[in-house]
């Protein structure tokens, strides 16, 4: 394995690049945006071993209202491509968790999911009505939310994408969800009551615990790394709390 410091993704997939650009543009709208320093061994990872080619690039930032803005771009053995993004709110602010994942296998989008997941009690009242108005009528292959998906909002979107048109429409859904998130973040005011902050921390902890029940994440990584490395990566890079 060779770890390198990279400034932009090496992936050339048009859909991933379009989504990545959209996410970065919305991220740039956040106040007081700063990069977060992390272990370079965990941020950018490359392997050129034939048959086990691997490329992972991570971006870490923080901003007003957000403790961690994480974007991961990955390609495994040239046939599995992943874009993963989670924006974790600062518990002092009543902002939902933005999450988005795209999985392509041999250029087929098997999974596309986006959500603003509640990070406090009754938080959904603030934004569910806006999410429900986002047009999702064009998609033909909606997928069932897994059992651990109780962490998601009522308007989580999860589907396989069957055409270029659906790929374009998914980009629009992501754009609208991000726009709602940015609006909520700009309206949010800091909270200083410890019991409220603790409740929000517990929501984020539960979000991470439930996400770690997704065995597909570890199954992919275990093909390239040992169990100790995979557990550390999942708990420190993907879903820390």
From Swiss-Prot:
One of its GO terms (molecular function) is phycocyanobilin:ferredoxin oxidoreductase activity. Pfam families: Fe_bilin_red. Its EC number is 1.3.7.5. The keyword Oxidoreductase applies. The keyword Signal does not apply. It is an enzyme of class 1 (oxidoreductase). GO terms for biological process: phytochromobilin biosynthetic process. Keywords: Oxidoreductase. It catalyses: (2R,3Z)-phycocyanobilin + 4 oxidized [2Fe-2S]-[ferredoxin] = biliverdin IXalpha + 4 reduced [2Fe-2S]-[ferredoxin] + 4 H(+). Catalyzes the four-electron reduction of biliverdin IX-alpha (2-electron reduction at both the A and D rings); the reaction proceeds via an isolatable 2-electron intermediate, 181,182-dihydrobiliverdin. NCBIfam families: PRK02816.1. HAMAP family: Ferredoxin_bilin_red. Belongs to the HY2 family. This is Phycocyanobilin:ferredoxin oxidoreductase. It comes from Prochlorococcus marinus (strain MIT 9312).
């Amino acid at each position: 394995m060779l770890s390198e410091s990279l400034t932009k993704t090496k992936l050339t997939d048009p859909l991933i690049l379009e989504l990545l650009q959209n996410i970065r543009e919305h991220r740039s709208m956040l106040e007081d945006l700063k990069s977060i320093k992390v272990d370079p061994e965990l941020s950018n990872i490359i392997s050129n071993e034939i048959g086990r080619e691997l490329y992972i690039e991570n971006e870490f930032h923080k901003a007003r209202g957000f403790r961690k803005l994480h974007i991961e771009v990955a390609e495994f053995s040239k046939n599995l491509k992943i874009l993963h993004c989670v924006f974790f709110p600062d518990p002092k602010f009543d902002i939902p968790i933005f999450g988005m994942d795209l999985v392509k296998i041999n250029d087929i989008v098997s999974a596309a999911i986006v959500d603003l997941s509640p990070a406090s009690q009754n938080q959904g009242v603030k934004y569910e009505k806006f999410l429900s108005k986002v047009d999702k009528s064009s998609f033909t292959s909606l997928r069932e939310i897994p059992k651990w998906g109780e962490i998601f909002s009522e308007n989580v979107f999860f589907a396989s994408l069957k055409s270029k048109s659906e790929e374009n429409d998914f980009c629009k859904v992501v754009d609208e969800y991000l726009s709602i998130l940015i609006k909520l973040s700009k309206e949010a005011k800091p909270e200083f009551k410890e019991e409220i902050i603790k409740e929000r921390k517990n929501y984020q902890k539960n979000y991470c615990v439930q996400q770690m029940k997704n065995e597909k994440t570890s199954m992919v990584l275990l093909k390239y790394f040992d169990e100790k490395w995979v557990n550390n990566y999942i708990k420190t890079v993907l879903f820390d709390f």
